Each structure stands twice: as structure tokens, then as C-alpha cells.
Design a protein with these regions (language model features):
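Accessory alpha-helical DNA-binding modules that contact the DNA backbone or grooves
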Residues: 1-141, 162-163, 183-197, 210-212, ...
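Charged catalytic cores and adjacent phosphate/nucleic-acid-binding surfaces used
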Residues: 101-263, 273-293, 298, 302-331, ...
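Active-site catalytic microenvironments in core metabolic enzymes, especially phosphate/sugar-handling
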Residues: 335-338
Length: 464
């Protein structure tokens, strides 16, 4: 039924409920529990029924899972392609958290500039992949797509499109700060444009529209602010002084420092699926100058120290041979992603560490340690001289698992003093280090690495 079935015992229970009460849906289960039917079954009782009701209640309170950014981008791209087929569409853009490139996205919002909103709306609601039309108005409409994904459309006059685009891109906090700046200038901002408010101000009360966001920000004495920066994290103050940071683009990226090949060192976690040679060819295609192969460490439970060392020597030889045959091409660093054990140790002997150019360490177990204990654990692993990178540092999995608790100022101070690097993991299900902590790391002057955590050659395309 989708609520709380996570063990073999849960599966047996669900099977009995289906068989004996004919339950086929979440609604059926709730009705059966509320009416007392479950407690009357042999082996259940009142306590079991109450437990099921509590699980259902907890499930109902849980917020719906948000869409991972790459999936939301794909859905939006398909809708935008469809909209562009209509001759009345002058311009089309995503809105909200999708346009700001947030790690997860709720409903997918899209805006269109057009002089014929009726024609655009009619075309939008005829989207062939829609499950149903949720709402259809004169300038707005909503569709439900398979997977219960909602797509909302707004159509604006091209003369005022820039104002609408700016307003509905957000974020909320960015817009509040922008509104405060405008008020100090005697202006009022909205999704329709900017209105003079101060007594005696030229054109008082007459709204000024903007075709583009660039014109909108310029009117407020500001440089254009890219959507990715609109979080009220200093961009409002930096923009008028021409001090906005330059965004990193794909063409700027010269390396991927977390890749898992299928070179078998009998790893503790999942092995990659593509050969080193295949990965090197893809890296060359992407224009990279260097990459790192970072297979998981050999399983400590299945190998003694000598076996681990021998496996790592074997990999060292393979990397050296590939570098020799790859002269004047992509350089390969021999690395490893090593588990940080609960007490802070690492399961690779020093003789094995000596085979590496550098190592990554990461958390794959015991996620709920108290903050002080977890911080001590991480710093202990980072103290090894061969360890340079803390990989997917919060250990979060979007929509699945919250991140670990760490004393980040203490972590960052350690990094600063010991010249360690911290990873931005580009796997769509992680996007870790989160953006807020990236900005903090930069303030400390800490070096950041980028890694796709690819376990297949196609995963190298996840660099974001």
C-alpha cells in the first residue's frame, strides 16, 4: 500500500491484509483500520491496528518527494520544446527553483511571452503527454503529467515579460531584499513592473514595464543577477558595486575527481561498470585535462592487510600503464574512495595508501552519531597525510536521507590549516556539498573539487 512496508515482516502483513480483507489501495487500508476490521484478524489485535493507523498518519504528514533537478530539467525541456512549436510564443522560460537550479524542484513553473495568450494556452493544454488538464484560464493553465507532476504555465504580454520573469524566478528572500532596496529609492516592485512612490517623483503612480530582466535590474541601479545567485546571500549588495561572482560554466571545468571504473579491487561497495579506457576516452571528449579513478576501498571484512596492499599495487600498475600509453592526453590520478569507520579510522594500511596519489574519504555508515562525535570521526580520517578530499561531505541523499551533523566551522578551520580539499559531488541524488556550505567554504579560502561519482561512463555527463 506504500505506507511503511520496509521489511519482510511488513510484506507478510500486507499480503495477509490483501488476501483476507481485499485491501487494494491506501484508502482501503485506512478504512479497514478505522473501522476495526484489522484488529479482528487473528494475530493482529488492537495494538497492531493502532500501529497501522499511526504509520498511516505519519505517512500523510510526510511532505511529497520533490523532483531531482536533472529530471525536472528534462520534463521542463520537453514542455518548452512543445510550446515553441506554437507561432504565438515569443519567449519561454522555466521559473522558480528550477530556473535557480535548486537541488530539488516541486511543481514545474513555466512562463511565456506572447501577444496571443489564448492561443498559447490552447496549445499548452493539448500537450500529448499530459494525464489531465488541472486548470485552464485566460493567461494561466496547469497540467498533471504521469507521475503526478504538476506543470503550471503563465502567459504575459512581451512588454512586461521581464518583470514577471524576475518576480516568479524568486527566491522569496531575494525578492524581499530587492523590494526593500526599491522602497529606499521611492519605488515599488511587482510582477507587473516598477512604480514610483515618492511624492514629486517623475511619473508618480505610473507603472513602468520591462521587456527583459536586464532592463528591470538596470532601472534599480544594479547589474543583472543570474538566477542561480538569487537567494539573498549577498547578491543584492554586490550587484550595484559590480562585484557579482562569475558563475562556473561547463567549459571552465578541467577535471572530474571522483570516478569509479570496473577495475576489480574487490571493493567494499558497488564497483564501476565501465573500463578505465572507456572513461579516459569520454574524459578526452569532454575536454578534461585530468581525472581520478576513485574506486571504493577493498572490503576489509573479506581481505587481510597483505591482500589489500596487493590489490592496490595491481591498480597502481594499471594506472601507470594507462598514463604511459596516454601520453599528451588526459592524465590519470590513482585514487581511492575510502570509508571513514565509526571510530574515525580508515580500512587501508599505510603500505596500501602509499600506492595512491591521494585519497578521498567519505561516510557510508553510522550516519546518526552526535555532532561532536561525528566531527571527531571525520577529522581523524582527514588527518592521514594521503587523504586530501572529503567526498559527499554531508552524506545526504536527496529525498532519501538527511545529512550528517558536523561542526562545520571546526571542519573548515582544519581544512584551512592543513590544505585539504572538499568535494562538490555532482551525482543528481546528492549534489553535496550543498550550496550554502559551498559559500561558507569559499569564505574560508578552502579549495573545492568536482566529482560526478560516476559508476558508468555516461555518469560523467552529470557534471553540473
Amino acid at each position: 500500500c506504500g505506507a511503511g512496508i520496509s521489511t519482510a515482516e511488513d510484506v507478510k502483513t500486507a499480503f495477509r491484509l490483501v488476501k483476507e480483507l481485499g485491501i487494494e489501495s491506501y484508502t482501503d487500508l485506512r478504512k479497514a483500520a478505522a473501522s476495526g476490521k484489522i484488529s479482528k484478524l487473528e494475530g493482529f489485535g488492537v495494538d497492531s491496528e493502532a500501529s497501522i493507523l499511526k504509520s498511516l498518519s505519519d505517512f500523510e504528514k510526510k511532505p511529497p518527494a520533490r523532483n531531482l533537478l536533472p529530471y525536472a530539467m528534462e520534463v521542463a525541456a520537453n514542455i518548452i520544446t512543445w510550446l515553441k512549436k506554437n507561432k504565438d510564443v515569443v519567449k519561454v522560460d522555466p521559473l522558480g527553483s528550477l530556473r535557480r537550479q535548486a537541488s530539488t524542484v516541486g511543481d514545474i513553473d513555466i512562463s511565456v511571452a506572447s501577444n496571443n495568450p489564448e492561443g498559447v494556452i490552447k496549445h499548452f493544454v493539448s500537450y500529448p503527454n499530459a494525464s489531465r488538464v488541472l486548470e485552464k484560464g485566460q493567461r494561466t493553465a496547469s497540467l498533471i503529467l504521469p507521475g503526478n507532476i504538476q506543470v503550471d504555465l503563465m502567459v504575459a504580454d512581451p512588454k512586461g515579460y521581464g518583470s514577471l520573469l524576475q518576480h516568479f524566478t524568486g527566491s522569496k528572500h531575494h525578492n524581499i531584499a530587492l523590494r526593500e532596496r526599491a522602497l529606499k529609492m521611492g519605488l515599488s516592485v511587482s510582477d507587473y513592473g516598477i512604480t514610483p512612490r515618492r511624492q514629486g517623483f517623475a511619473g508618480q503612480g505610473k507603472i513602468k514595464q520591462f521587456k527583459t530582466e536586464e532592463e528591470f535590474y538596470r532601472y534599480l541601479g544594479m547589474d543583472y543577477i543570474p538566477p542561480e545567485l538569487r537567494e539573498d546571500s549577498g547578491e543584492i549588495e554586490a550587484s550595484p558595486n559590480h562585484k557579482l561572482p562569475k558563475l562556473v560554466e561547463l567549459k571552465d571545468i578541467k577535471a572530474d575527481l571522483q570516478i569509479h571504473s570496473n577495475f576489480d579491487i574487490e571493493t567494499s561497495h558497488d564497483l564501476g561498470q565501465s573500463s578505465m579506457k572507456e572513461v579516459c576516452e569520454k574524459a578526452k571528449e569532454l575536454g578534461y585535462e585530468y581525472i581520478a579513478f576513485t574506486e571504493h576501498n577493498p572490503s576489509k571484512s573479506k581481505h587481510g592487510e597483505k591482500q589489500i596492499i596487493d590489490l592496490l599495487k595491481k591498480k597502481r600498475q594499471a594506472v601507470d600503464q594507462l598514463n604511459y600509453s596516454n601520453k599528451n592526453s588526459v592524465h590519470i590520478f590513482n585514487s581511492l574512495e575510502i570509508d571513514i569507520l565509526p571510530e574515525g579510522g580508515i580500512p587501508v594500511p599505510d603500505a596500501g595508501m602509499d600506492t595512491l596519489d591521494f585519497a578521498l574519504v567519505s561516510i557510508h555508515s553510522s550516519f546518526r552519531l552526535p555532532r561532536a562525535e561525528m566531527t571527531k570521526r571525520v577529522l581523524s580520517a582527514l588527518s592521514h597525510p594521503k587523504v586530501k578530499v572529503f567526498a559527499h561531505p554531508t552524506a545526504r541523499k536527496l529525498n532519501e536521507r538527511e545529512g550528517i551533523e558536523l561542526n562545520w566551522p571546526e571542519i573548515f578551520e582544519f581544512y584551512k590549516k592543513n590544505n585539504k580539499w572538499i568535494e562538490i559531488n555532482c551525482d543528481p541524488g546528492r549534489l553535496d556539498l550543498p550550496d550554502v556550505l559551498v559559500k561558507e567554504a569559499i569564505k574560508y579560502g578552502i579549495k573545492l573539487t568536482l566529482g560526478t561519482d560516476a559508476h558508468h561512463v555516461d555518469g560523467l555527463n552529470n557534471m553540473m
